[in-house]
Amino acid sequence: MRQLLTYMRDEKHIPPERLEFKDIKAETIAEFLLWLEKNGQISISTRNQRLAAIHSFYRYAQTEYPDNLLEMQRILSIPFKKKSRPTVNYLTKEEMKLLLEQPDVRNHKGRRDLALMAILYDTGARVQELIDLCVKDIRLHAPATVTLKGKGNKMRCVPIMGNTVQLVSRYMDDYNLKSNGRQQSPLFFNSRGEKLTRPGICYILNKYFKQAKKANPESILSDRIHPHMLRHAKAVHMLESGVNLIYIRDFLGHASVTTTEIYLKTETELKRSVLEKNYPDVVTQDIPEWRNDTDLLQWLNDFCR
C-alpha cells in the first residue's frame, strides 16, 4: 500500500493526508499496476502480489465504509495477470548417459563427482537438498534410500537404484565416510571439509557437460546445464516410463500436483504417447455402410428438397 500512496502523491498529486476513498477508482488501480510494471520493472508475480494486497485491504474496507461499496467491488474485480509457464529444460536419457560417462573414475575426485551427479539425478533432488545431505541421510542396504530435507523443512525419503548405491558406497569408502563419528558430516564436501556450495556444484556439472558436448556434439542438443535440469530430467524420464503423476509429485516433494503438471507439456512426442496410452482410438478410417448406399443418399437428398 505504501507504493500506492507514493503513486497517488507523485502521479496524481494527492498527498496521503488528503487522500480519500473517492479519489481511488478501479481505473486508478489499473493505472497504478501499469505504472509499477513500467517504472519498477517488476515481474508478473510481483505485480499480482501488489494487487492481492490491494484486494485484501478493500475486502476489509468495504465492511467499514459501505458508502463506497460499488467502487470497491469494481476494484476487487480487477483480475490477476496470467503468466506463461516457463519452458522446462532437461537432459534426454542419451544426454544424461553421456554426461555420467565423463568423470575419470580412476581417481577419488572423479568417483566423487560421478556419485554426486548420480545422486542428483537419481533422487531428483534440488541443489540445496543435495548440499544439505549428511552421511546419516544415506541408507545403502536394501531398500536403499536417501532422506532429503525440502522446502519448509519437509522431509521425504526417496529410493536410489542399485548402480547409484554402488557409486556412492565406493565414494564413501574412498573418503572414509562409513566410519563411526562421520554420521553428521556432509556427504559431499570441498577440500576444507565444508559443504559444497551451489557455485561449486554448478562448476562440476559444467565441467563434465562441456566435455560431453565436445566429444558428442551431435548427441548433446542442450546448450547449457544447471543442477535443476537433472531434477527436470528425472521427472520427465519417469513420466516417459509411465510412472503416475501423483507418485512423481511425492517423489519431487511438490506441494501440489499442479506444479508437477508442467512436465506434461515438455515435448510433443511425450504428450502424444501419454494420450495414446490413456485414450481409445475412437476415430477410424472405415467408411460407414450407409455412405456406400447411393440409393439411400439420393432418397435423403430428395426428402430434404
Positions of the model-derived regions?
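Conserved catalytic core of the tyrosine transesterase superfamily
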Residues: 1-305
